[in-house]
């Protein structure tokens, strides 16, 4: 038993009671509203809300009010509609989203797309300062401009540089003084004024690829190498002689190796005089060895050793033969040219040496 009274048995009874009290108060409120409505004086229609008044002005700055008007519903005309909407209210309302396929500038006036001039002011041109100077000079009929004229050309043709003049003007001035492609020309006596003229070096016109100023400038080393003529190989030979020394054999061999690949070396015969010298050397050696072996060999081993020691003269003669002619450059680099010109000569030399060593170091059968 509670002191505040007995609680209802149904748990939803309290909610039902509250809902009933709310409905009673709500009905009383509407009765009061219905009684007060006829007593109000008829107010004049507000400007901009009537059908005729709202359609006369121009398009509204709001995008959701720029579309065509909605078809008025029957309940907005005051006929059989609800009493809570007075006659004429919302008759001139527009729909929120216009039935357009896409949104344009008229749909969003606050997001106006800039024109081409505005875009050029915001975007930096894709040209270097040297390219801007070259364009200014080439567009002039006299092919020469002063510093102030170059400034004027850049500012007039590229609106991006109108914002801050101090930065890019310093860069142009530095490019004129540091770049070898721009030459300073003094004023004539009959041309009064301030400042010298600037012109393009004729050798640097290829740097911009005939007006394609967006292309990067070629390296200076490439332009210097392109200026070499056919006598460049001769200059390299002289430099090699000075650095290595013409008296030393290493310097001569290095010079011969560096001269390989030139047109002069390609036109010469590959195995001309060198083959003749080596064959003559081998012929002399082979004839001497044959004469030595054909002579009656002594019967004692000590005597044979003496003959072998005498044959050193022929070996020294063979070793004294030139390996390669100093006037002919061979295509093999880093390796010496053999004395024997062909495989047959090398095999013959091997057989002769083998027979020489065996016949003179060991005794023949039947000889004591």
From Swiss-Prot:
<dbReference type="GO" id="GO:0005634">
    <property type="term" value="C:nucleus"/>
</dbReference>
<keyword id="KW-0804">Transcription</keyword>
<keyword id="KW-0539">Nucleus</keyword>
<feature type="compositionally biased region" description="Polar residues">
    <location>
        <begin position="255"/>
        <end position="264"/>
    </location>
</feature>
<feature type="region of interest" description="Disordered">
    <location>
        <begin position="243"/>
        <end position="272"/>
    </location>
</feature>
<feature type="DNA-binding region" description="Fork-head">
    <location>
        <begin position="124"/>
        <end position="218"/>
    </location>
</feature>
<dbReference type="InterPro" id="IPR050211">
    <property type="entry name" value="FOX_domain-containing"/>
</dbReference>
<dbReference type="InterPro" id="IPR030456">
    <property type="entry name" value="TF_fork_head_CS_2"/>
</dbReference>
<comment type="function">
    <text>Possible transcriptional activator.</text>
</comment>
<dbReference type="Pfam" id="PF00250">
    <property type="entry name" value="Forkhead"/>
</dbReference>
<feature type="region of interest" description="Disordered">
    <location>
        <begin position="33"/>
        <end position="54"/>
    </location>
</feature>
<protein>
    <recommendedName>
        <fullName>Forkhead box protein I2</fullName>
    </recommendedName>
</protein>
<keyword id="KW-0238">DNA-binding</keyword>
<dbReference type="GO" id="GO:0003700">
    <property type="term" value="F:DNA-binding transcription factor activity"/>
</dbReference>
<dbReference type="InterPro" id="IPR036388">
    <property type="entry name" value="WH-like_DNA-bd_sf"/>
</dbReference>
<dbReference type="GO" id="GO:0043565">
    <property type="term" value="F:sequence-specific DNA binding"/>
</dbReference>
<dbReference type="InterPro" id="IPR036390">
    <property type="entry name" value="WH_DNA-bd_sf"/>
</dbReference>
<dbReference type="InterPro" id="IPR018122">
    <property type="entry name" value="TF_fork_head_CS_1"/>
</dbReference>
<dbReference type="InterPro" id="IPR001766">
    <property type="entry name" value="Fork_head_dom"/>
</dbReference>
<keyword id="KW-0010">Activator</keyword>
<keyword id="KW-0805">Transcription regulation</keyword>
